[in-house]
Amino acid sequence: SPMPVLAATSPTDCFECAYMASKIALEHMTPVVLLTDAFVANGSAAWKLPDLNDYPAINPPYVTPDMAGNWTPYQRNEETGARYWATPGTEGFMHRLGGLEKDCITSAISTDPANHQKMTDMRQAKIDYIANEIPELEILGNPEADLLVVGWGGTYGHLYSAVESMNAIGKKVAMVHFNYINPMPKNTEEILRRSVSYTHLRAHETLS
């Protein structure tokens, strides 16, 4: 099933990514995968406890009293595709919960192939919309680079150091690094299409 995927770049970035993963999960009513790795787990850094007032507010799509009577469990926001959240015990919004796939409107268990495809398409559209709310990619390093290095997650520090070292000896190297893997930032295609002007495009998943 389509779902958002984030990757933390460093120990200090873990809080930021966890907060944003929670914001996406609660506002868009979707599971979120947050990736870390050995570089992040075994690293350390000084980190100041942040002021949560400096972070964007989390606004779940709760049901409202005026929706009672016409509400269905899988009713969605037309713009975002997110389902409305009726917390257990809310008067007028009784519904069933479970892990099996449900009818796209009623929440009754469904094994109908057409309903399954429709639900998958709706989930994908919901995930695609999230790209409107995440930051765009930033190109680091030499803006006139011959080589673009692409990385994600805990490889950030190693790749950035390598890019800086290469530029220091006269090589022309740039870098983009992904925190948001699904959906990708909206300018991803634009940046990677520029690779036609790069002599080389190199993606790194691990370091060796």
Where are the regions that the model predicts?
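Generic long, charged, amphipathic alpha-helical segments
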Residues: L159-I191
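Short acidic, glycine/serine/threonine-rich loops at helix termini
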Residues: E16-Y19, G43-L49, Y160-S161
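Conserved thiamine diphosphate
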Residues: S1-V33, D37, I58-G69
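Single conserved hydrophobic/aromatic residue that forms the stacking wall/gate
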Residues: A203-S208
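Generic beta-strand/beta-sheet core signal
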Residues: A8, V33-D37, V150-G153, V176-F178, ...
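Conformationally flexible catalytic loops at phosphate/diphosphate-handling active centers
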Residues: V32-E138
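C-terminal substrate/ligand-recognition segments
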Residues: L148-L159, M166
